[in-house]
Design a protein with these regions (language model features):
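Short, glycine/acidic-rich hinge or "gate" loops at secondary-structure transitions
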Residues: 44-53, 161-164, 181-190, 227-231
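Acidic/histidine-rich catalytic neighborhood
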Residues: 171-224
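Structured secondary-structure scaffolds
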Residues: 19-94, 108-109
Length: 303
């Protein structure tokens, strides 16, 4: 804080996020996070990748979109720092052409995507094709759109919603729409995709949750903004006919159809329907039991 300019930054930063907690350790942790985030980005600068501005030797020197970016930005909403969250908005909204190039060429007309890791302008290389490439990790931009949705919900800026978020979310969900199919059971299914850092499965819970959330959110947006989009019937059909989340009677949510959660992993991608998407909710007694069972099994796995 010897630099007057830097001192002014933190004088502005801390009052905006002021919070006291009865537990001193938790309060200290909170303030450390606020300091870290203020050190790592500005609204008009690069998004926060795995190392931020600190140069260090690491196997992960990029922006990783399968968990890291999303979790990093959550803290900025409720802490009253949408000014810093703008770095994520700008990274996505200002790099649409790069997001288009991340999609295999045959689908670039109406779809956007981002791969597991990218540079600071969202160039990741082409993502996989569901049902063709075993590691087709296709839900990462929809998950990033959930972070953009949370930012919008704290701003409630409908011009931003109409001109920025809606087009990106629509095209992110469009990639799924190229591959959904109706099974003999009359339900809509997804071919094999990749659950982040775990493995591949048909009807992958990670992707079913994001597809469902995306369609629900697109319908909410079109209703709010009175947008008469030609895909509205398709989104409604998906919500009505999408196959249920694959579950195990004893252990809860699975990775996907016929693929159990069998070994320990910190990524909780198969649980996105419960959190942060809230497609299943603890207020429903049956869903509460499913959430509790799934969490206990996920946390109880060792190895």
């Amino acid at each position: 804080l010897r630099s007057r300019g830097l001192g002014d930054v933190y004088k502005r930063q801390y009052p905006s996020s002021f919070l006291t907690l009865p537990d001193g350790m938790k309060e200290n942790f909170y303030w450390i996070q606020m300091y870290k985030l203020a050190s790592a980005t500005r609204g008009d600068r690069a998004l926060i990748d795995n190392t931020g501005p600190w140069l260090t030797v690491t196997p992960w020197p990029n922006a990783w979109w399968n968990l890291n970016v999303q979790l990093t930005y959550w803290a900025l909403n409720a802490s009253n720092h949408l000014d810093l969250a703008a770095s994520l908005e700008n990274a996505i909204y200002n790099n649409i052409e790069n997001l288009k190039k991340n999609v295999p060429e045959a689908y670039r007309k109406d779809a956007l995507a981002i791969g597991r890791s990218s540079n600071l302008v969202c160039e990741s290389g082409e993502i996989g094709i569901p049902g063709v490439d075993k590691a087709a990790e296709v839900g990462l931009l929809p998950w990033a759109c959930h972070s953009l949705w949370l930012i919008y919900r704290h701003k409630m800026d409908d011009e931003l919603l109409r001109n920025k978020l809606f087009p990106v979310l629509k095209q992110a969900i469009n990639y799924y729409l190229h591959f959904t199919y109706k099974g003999k059971d009359g339900k809509i299914h997804l071919p094999q995709t990749y659950s982040p850092e775990y493995g591949s499965a048909e009807d992958c819970n990670f992707d079913l949750a994001l597809l469902s959330w995306g369609c629900r959110t697109l319908l909410e947006i079109t209703g709010r903004l009175n947008i008469d989009d030609p895909l509205i019937p398709r989104w409604k059909t998906i919500l009505e006919e999408l196959t249920p989340f694959p579950t195990d009677p004893a252990n809860g949510l699975m990775i996907g159809r016929d693929v159990p959660y069998a070994f320990s992993h910190r990524h909780y991608s198969h649980l996105l329907a419960a959190y942060p998407l809230y497609l299943i909710n603890k207020e429903n007694p049956e869903e509460y039991d499913l959430i509790e069972k799934s969490l206990l099994y996920w946390q109880g796995k060792s190895g």
